Curated annotation (Swiss-Prot), chains A, B:
Taxonomic source organism: Megalodesulfovibrio gigas (strain ATCC 19364 / DSM 1382 / NCIMB 9332 / VKM B-1759) (Desulfovibrio gigas)
Protein name per UniProt: Flavoredoxin
Keyword Flavoprotein: yes
InterPro entries named in the record: Flavin_Rdtase-like_dom (IPR002563), Flavoredoxin (IPR052174), Split_barrel_FMN-bd (IPR012349)
Keyword entries, A-Z: Flavoprotein, FMN
Length: 194, 194
């Protein structure tokens, strides 16, 4: 038996994305967003949505670029702070002791201490209401060597990405792998005639 | 030291979304997508992206509606199968023994056995390349009573949502809560002068 929860923005899990930008003074800034995801494979594109009232909004509109950092468990409190405080009120990254370098591909900063970052050029902007959705075309992804194996594949146990639960408002690490895509479902596939 | 992984569609984690539609014969169908997320709070909107080659694509274009089911741990193999097989080849839901009812709000089916479903009206369609992104305005969310407490709040331990790791291609349950949003970051906030 199902009960109605009403019309709400609820999906589980969401990523915990730190959006990096340069403001109109050229200062690096960052904010945390959970409204986002992958939206295309070729070209590789992602979405991130944020409110017009944010300090980051103007930077995105002006520079047409952002970096998107995947939050790992060690940066839980830092990412939460980046979602609470505003770049208008001071140097958030400095407060956290985080350092940035300029991306060579897009007009946005890379936060060096975060393990995985997407460098994105904004290709579409959609005003959806309270949030504006920025579709970014991924120009490159950079990852710390420590979260890659010798073949350059990602090591999730090293990356330790965080997931977020909207409305419940909690952050979670990933449990163990419970199955593999395009494999776990094979047991339901029709058996081929012998 | 960071290494370049190239331009790829990578974010961690993604949700595991089962997209419900009616085909041109009025038959219920479902496919699994990981390219999606929340994109606006007011009005509440979500995105889901899929390829033109999918059977579901034509249904979305025709009916301008979909349901989005959050996959829970018990439905891991079912959702993986729904992402492997095509509705062109047979009754996927029937194969899985899953049953549907018609949504009263949008022209799409609700899979009764999945614990949480969003009923969505398509408000924007964006051809991004290999994938087309369908922005859906959430008309209502319905949840099994067993995943709600007496106040109607979601119980994550009962819901057990799955997260997906692109490229690594594994499904994961959520670990324990490691912190609470708008709270864990307080330790970085400037202390107010006494």
């Amino acid at each position: 038996m199902k009960r109605s929860l009403g019309a709400k923005p609820l999906l589980f899990p969401t990523p915990v994305l730190v959006v990096g930008t340069y403001d109109d003074q050229g200062r690096p800034n960052a904010m945390t967003a959970a409204w986002g995801g992958i939206c295309c494979s070729k070209p590789p594109c992602v979405t991130v949505s944020l409110r017009k009232a944010t300090y980051t909004y103007a930077s995105l509109m002006a520079r047409k670029a952002y970096t998107l950092h995947v939050t790992d468990e060690p940066h839980l409190t830092a990412s939460d702070f980046l979602g609470m405080a505003s770049g208008r009120d001071g140097d958030k990254l400095g407060t956290l002791g985080l350092t940035t370098v300029r991306s060579e591909l897009v007009d946005a900063p890379i936060i060096q201490e975060y393990p995985l970052v997407l460098e994105c050029k904004i290709v579409h902007v959609h005003d959806l209401g309270l949030h504006t959705m920025f579709v970014g075309e991924v120009q490159d992804i950079k990852a710390d060597a420590r979260v890659l194996d010798e073949k350059g594949h990602l090591l999730l146990d090293a990356l330790k990405p965080l997931g977020f639960m909207p409305e419940v408002r909690t952050y979670h690490g990933m449990g163990p792998a419970l199955g593999r895509a395009f494999d776990a479902g094979k047991l339901h596939m029709p058996k081929k005639a012998e």
